[in-house]
Amino acid sequence: MFKTFISSLVTKHFKKKLDNWTIKEEDVTEVLKQIRITLLDADVNLLVVKDFIKNVRQQVVGRVIAQGEDPEQVLIAIIKEQLTNILGKNPSEIDVSQHPLKIMMIGLQGSGKTTTSAKLANYFKNKFSKKPLLIALDIYRPAAIDQLEILAKEVNIDFFQKGTQDPVITANQALEYAKTNQEDVIIFDTAGRLQSDEELIDELKNIRNRVHPDEILLVIDAMSGQDVINVATEFNRHLDLTGFIITKLDSDARAGAALSLTHLLNLPVKFIGDGERIGSLDIFYPERIADRILGLGDIVTLAEKAADVLDENKTKKSLARMLIGKMDLEDLMEQMKQLTKLGSVSTIAKMLPNNTKLSEDKLLEAEQKMKVWQIMLTSMTLKERRDPSVFKKQPNRKIRVVKGSGRKPDDLNKLLSEWEKAKKKMSEMGNMIKHGRNPFGQFGM
């Protein structure tokens, strides 16, 4: 999200003293300057940056550091609090008690609006056991209608469309259909444009006045620049938005402009999309995003995702086998399947706490490596995955797997070598646990 973690700037530029002391202006001048540069580089709006720096300075200058307090952690806590305030302070969840709940989705072309509409329907279905209806109102792009229908079928959600018929008439008919079929969440996927224009605004107004939506959500691409602020301001002026959904936060986008919207327009970000998978939509928690910007990770969201998508029994079984030294390639394949459910390597990495940035190239390399391994593992028989020693006894099996997977012999050799190392390491950790020793001591934990 940001090229430099703010916590690393504090470590590098904050002038700390050893004894009890009061933080002075000169102690934070350089660190605030570097934070300002980082925020601007991330495309955070200038007015937002000025307000943020001013608020941090007011909170920190004159702060007395008591004996036993870590001044660095004091400053980080103040920065986190002010970042959280800028981002909206508290999560803004949609009230699902309304029946039916009507949501109008708007956005420019390419923002991910149609995919996000399907993700939102899937979210309400799985999280609240609702019966959603997806309505295609983008009559100018037949491909958008087809896309929404395909996504609806993929997650078994009801779909309504009337081709190129006037979208206001279609919206009205959809309401009747929803009533007849007892749909309790109605999502209108409206037309997108390359830019906001009078014709589009008039159409959206007419739809809004007919369906009286409970939520009007503007879908924003995280890769958008400062112009998105003008777009959001214009839509809000005419339609009275209730919030935003930011998409593509799993990309290497700076996202600063999108994250500036709440402070500038006093409207909440309701959800974020962090992947292409239909389940990759999360409630926007300002404090958790502040942690990511600081470099503290977002373990809570990662744990929640794991609880939602991972098969607990399979995960426990594989882990138990690993710790007693019985890990085989079938276990490895199962663990990789489970990991894939959490999202891309990049998505997971960005939720882990660290003060050094893994380059996007390294993350893509890891993603590609995992895909190659999955291809080779699926080219093996169950016997080969359960007993990889057969590759040494019968080398012809390697030739078959290499040909079947379309990979090179070296790729298979690397897979087998790294699996052997991982098996040995997990077995060592299991023995340490068995004898009451800390298996993570070797990592300084």
Where are these regions (language model features)?
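Flexible beta-alpha connector loops of hexameric P-loop NTPases
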Residues: K24, I65-A66, D70, Q109, ...
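Short beta-strand segments
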Residues: I106-G107, D189, V219, G273
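Switch II (G3) loop of P-loop NTPases
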Residues: P132-A144, E154-V211
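Short, surface-exposed alpha-helical segments at coil->helix boundaries
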Residues: L46, R141, I145-E149, I229, ...
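Conserved phosphate-handling catalytic cores of large alpha/beta enzymes
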Residues: A171-A174, E183, Q195, E199-N209, ...
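Non-catalytic terminal/linker segments enriched in charged/polar, low-complexity residues
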Residues: M1-I106, K119-L120, N126-A136, E154-V155, ...
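Conserved lysine of the Walker
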Residues: K113
